[in-house]
């Protein structure tokens, strides 16, 4: 992995009691040795694999102002990280779920892009066996379950300040509150809505097929082509590019898919991240509620599965063998 660490600092938040969250500040930067590089490579991998929300700094963001000073050399990285940890403590202390943790600030380069990653990492206890086969307790950073993480694409931020996607953050296991606290600390607002972009893409595909008056099978085959491209991009960690997608798809009528999307005003970005859950709707129908969960391939609608809109009734002809076996055993037949 081509990841080069420029500067990295660690500090700590210690929860003394229910009302007190203390700060322990390190006096020097961490050396970028092999252990540190391995840790950052793992954190980068874990973060890159997770679903993220996008944002941008507010005009009055203290963190953004301090980061600009650090980038210009008016303030060193250690001082920047120490002051930011204090602000982080002040914001986190407002929430009842506040816990301590190791606060990490790392400025690094990956594939010619500069990043600043900020995270609060929890420590976990485990057991280890030494060479004499004695057991002892050990502590480790729980990187795989890190959920308080934000990353700033410094290259994008400095070269394209009007961007709505240079800042990313995780939603977190405890839900919306983590997002709120981190956005308050960063003094940022949500930017590019990835799910909305993917929903817009699905609508554009549906309208494009309808405009061309495709039959059911032709329409589903076209949707499958869209899904195949998008899924390949997702697996490769790449974004959906409208122009590239249009080149992959057969032209329906006089306009290709990109021209149609632009003229019809779907407000799609030239490229945007793929959202797995939304894209799945291209090839499947799924829903749950009231103790019922249903998921089936779109091709089955009208063949083995029939929906009566008037009575809101779904009829399934031919149940899966494992489901049929359960039903038979439960009915005593």
UniProtKB/Swiss-Prot annotation:
The protein's UniProt keywords, in alphabetical order, are: Cytoplasm
Where in or outside the cell it occurs: the entry states: Cytoplasm, Nucleoid
State a single Gene Ontology molecular function: single-stranded RNA binding
An example of a Gene Ontology cellular component annotation for this protein is: cytoplasm
The reply on keyword Chaperone is no
Q: Which family does it belong to?
A: Belongs to the YejK family.
> What PANTHER family does the entry give?
NUCLEOID-ASSOCIATED PROTEIN YEJK (PTHR38772:SF1), PTHR38772
Name of the protein in question: Nucleoid-associated protein YE1421
Organism field: Yersinia enterocolitica serotype O:8 / biotype 1B (strain NCTC 13174 / 8081)
């Amino acid at each position: 992995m081509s990841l080069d660490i420029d500067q990295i600092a660690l500090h700590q938040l210690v929860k003394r009691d229910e009302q007190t969250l203390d700060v322990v500040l390190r006096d020097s930067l961490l050396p970028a040795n092999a252990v540190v590089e391995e840790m950052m490579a793992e954190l980068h991998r874990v973060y890159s694999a997770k679903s993220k929300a996008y944002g941008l700094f507010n005009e009055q963001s203290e963190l953004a102002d301090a980061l600009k000073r650090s980038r210009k050399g008016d303030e060193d990285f250690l001082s920047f990280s120490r002051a930011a940890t204090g602000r982080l403590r002040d914001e986190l202390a407002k929430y009842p779920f506040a816990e301590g943790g190791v606060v990490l600030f790392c400025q690094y380069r990956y594939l010619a892009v500069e990043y600043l990653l900020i995270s609060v990492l929890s420590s976990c206890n485990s057991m280890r066996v030494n060479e004499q086969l004695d057991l002892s307790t050990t502590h480790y950073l729980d990187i795989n379950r890190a959920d308080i993480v934000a990353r700033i694409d410094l290259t994008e931020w400095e070269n394209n300040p009007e961007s709505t996607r240079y800042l990313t953050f995780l939603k977190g296991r405890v839900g919306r509150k983590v997002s709120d606290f981190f956005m308050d600390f960063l003094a940022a607002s949500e930017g590019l809505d990835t799910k909305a972009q993917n929903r817009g893409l699905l609508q554009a595909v549906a309208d494009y097929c309808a405009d061309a008056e495709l039959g059911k099978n032709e329409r589903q085959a076209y949707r499958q082509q869209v899904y195949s491209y998008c899924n390949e991009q997702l697996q490769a960690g790449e974004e959906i590019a409208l122009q590239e997608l249009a080149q992959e798809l057969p032209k329906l009528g006089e306009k290709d898919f990109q021209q149609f999307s632009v003229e019809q005003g779907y407000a799609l970005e030239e490229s945007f991240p793929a959202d797995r859950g939304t894209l799945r709707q291209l090839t499947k129908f799924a829903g749950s509620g009231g103790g019922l969960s249903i998921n089936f391939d779109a091709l089955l609608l009208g063949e083995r599965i029939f929906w009566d809109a008037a009575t809101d009734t779904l009829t399934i002809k031919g149940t899966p063998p494992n489901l049929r076996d359960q039903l038979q055993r439960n009915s005593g037949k």
